Amino acid sequence: VLKTFDEMDGNTTSKLLGQYHKALALAAVGDFENADKILSGNVNGSLRLTRGSLIAHAQIMAELSKEEEALELIDKMALKGQDNELDLLRQNIQNGKSSYDYITSAQQGIAEVLFTLAFALNGSENDQTSLLYARLAQSLRPNNAETILLTSELLRDQKQFDLAIENYETISKDNSLYLSAEIGRAETLIAADKPDLAIAVLKELAVNYKKSSRVFMSLGDAYRGQKKFMLARSAYDKAQSLIGKPNSSHWFLFYTLGICNERLGNWPRAEMNFRMALDLSPNQPLILNYLGYLLVEKNKKLEEARKMIEKAVAARPNSGFIIDSLGWSLFTLGKFEDAIQPMERAVELMPDDPIVNDHLGDVYWKVGRKREAKFQWRRAISFDPEEKELVRIRKKLEVGLDEVQAQEKKK
């Protein structure tokens, strides 16, 4: 059997899968030392495939009296308070109560093979195959919460919302992954256009998991999706109070806080949030683009804004909204001819976006292509812009961009 695992060397992925399951097979018969060598990367390269491989390796190290190394591994890969099962494993190792029980039978091993394949294919073009493997894994190991979560996520991604919700609900309250299941159920309700039900689920979790920053982050995301920015900011503020000292994984929290504060009209605090997010993750294109775009919109620090957006474009050259920001920054700097190419590219990537079409219309107007400008503005109106933007676009069609800008300067 072990030789079969070694023969799985067709490519890097199959080799990693083969060695991972060889390690699990060794651990199942009590050969923890050789299992540890494989999972530690001492043989055939480092292995860290799934959350399950982290749990298995930590349990194996604890069996070898490597408790400190096991705790270091968990702390490196998972934040406290973000994963109840890993928090419990951490506690058991600290108290000397951990024992290896991740995979102990052939049936569990086959289920883990299927789960690993489903996990590896998730997000690829083989979603149906991924779901098939996940369903088979769940049939062999019906009470395995991690498999249930993956299957539910795949069902949600394929818009089988009722089946996904039903599957999430099979994880009981006493399971360490119940919180993850409930958050997944809430996210599925949002995807199914039932935000009020999702928010009700998350509000109940906020009562029962008062110290979970993850719950308040999810609640903030749900409110933000409904443009309830005051409630979203309150939830994010609560999450911030629970995280302790921020690290690189917390950039999204400060990014979303910045969005809420900007929408609520508190620009100084919003800029502070965005710059904190950027300190935590300096090369994150979402932050670079959003902050850069807002600086351009406010006509502040334009050169810094342009450099931020150019850096974001370099990271995501096929992102329509980021390329739109680049074109708009050039437009704001008065470089109208230079703005044409990125704005046209942005419209190619996001043809149905009202803001991008409106921006291209403005660029065309400034270079004298007024008939094309009006065409783009009419397209923008057809894509249902927000009321404030709609009024401004109609005004531009009536009197032209130059007159609208002149009137705005007088205010």
Describe the function of each predicted region.
Residues 30, 65, 125, 159, ...:
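Residue-level detector of the short coil/turn that links helix A to helix B
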